[in-house]
Amino acid sequence: MTQRVVSIVGPTASGKTGLGIAIARRLAEAGERAEIVNADAYQMYRGMDIGTAKPTAEEQAVVSHHLIDIIDPEDTMSVARFQQLARETIADLQSRGIRPILVGGSGLYARAAIDDITFPGTDPDVRTRLEEREKTEGAGALFDELRAKDPEAAARMDPRNPRRTIRALEVIELTGKPYSASLPRYRYVIPSVQIGLDLDRPDLDHRIDLRTKQMYDDGFIEEVERLRPHLGATAVRALGYQQIIDLLDGIWDVNDAFADIAQKTKRLARKQMGWFGRDPRIHWLQALNPKLVDNAMAIIAHADAGDYDSIDARADEYTQHHLGDITA
């Protein structure tokens, strides 16, 4: 029996934090230690609490959390850097007999921690040269070049997306290897089990509306006003922060700003469901089911026993043949 990393995924406002804490407490009742590893890209920034729905001090006191409040808003957190930090944290916890519970809505971040994903570097000069070629020769010419150099990658990409074509050619030039060799794989490098939280759209939209109102009540405007001089180019992209900056600048009134936050959060939630829905390894549970925690614990027990190994082993082949471009 292998103790798996538990990864809790799903759209924003679906209740991932609460489920992670509930699972950790249930494991503790059974005599097993568990701690939470954050996989939300923006909860890693200090001071960005209300806008990112960061676990409260009370929640963090119940179960130890890792990779929260680890960088300043002026700094940049890349997915490659997160991958290194997350894997180091997971290895440390496991070495001490503690089960990691990965919690977060950032799909690529959650996968980067446990999946076979590499992140080749970039070169601004190469990127600029390819972008200039796209302007003069056209996207079709660059895609034809990619098809000749890496047919597998070309077959899994949209020729109407020159940004990805340029990135693929950049990686080929920098690494001397096919771009397909660095594409994300639905293949665990750390034994894991993924539990997804699902809600009907009206229920999820209602939760998002309530959360947005709570952000206002909790002082989100004041949080952004305090952080504004320190928000770097990456941190300011967190949903909601730009709307409040525009509010402070008089571009929007309060109602319009928070209405836009709610609308864009709902759009993000649908995008997240599309991202996670591509992964056949995720075990989906109804977030509002009274037996949610019981069902999650049953899935973890089956995973530890190896009952899902054969399905997980075929996941990458399935996605490549049935879902096409897995870099979306």
From Swiss-Prot:
Task: Locate the residues binding ATP.
Answer: G10, P11, T12, A13, S14, G15, K16, T17
List keywords of the entry alphabetically: ATP-binding, Magnesium, Nucleotide-binding, Transferase, tRNA processing
Which catalysed reactions does the entry list for this protein? adenosine(37) in tRNA + dimethylallyl diphosphate = N(6)-dimethylallyladenosine(37) in tRNA + diphosphate
Residues bound to substrate:
T12, A13, S14, G15, K16, T17
A Pfam family hit: IPPT
| Highest rank taxon of the organism | Bacteria
The record's top EC class is transferase
Return the HAMAP family for the record: IPP_trans
Q: Which family does it belong to?
A: Belongs to the IPP transferase family.
Q: What is this protein called?
A: tRNA dimethylallyltransferase
Species of origin: Bifidobacterium longum subsp. infantis (strain ATCC 15697 / DSM 20088 / JCM 1222 / NCTC 11817 / S12)
Gene behind this protein:
miaA
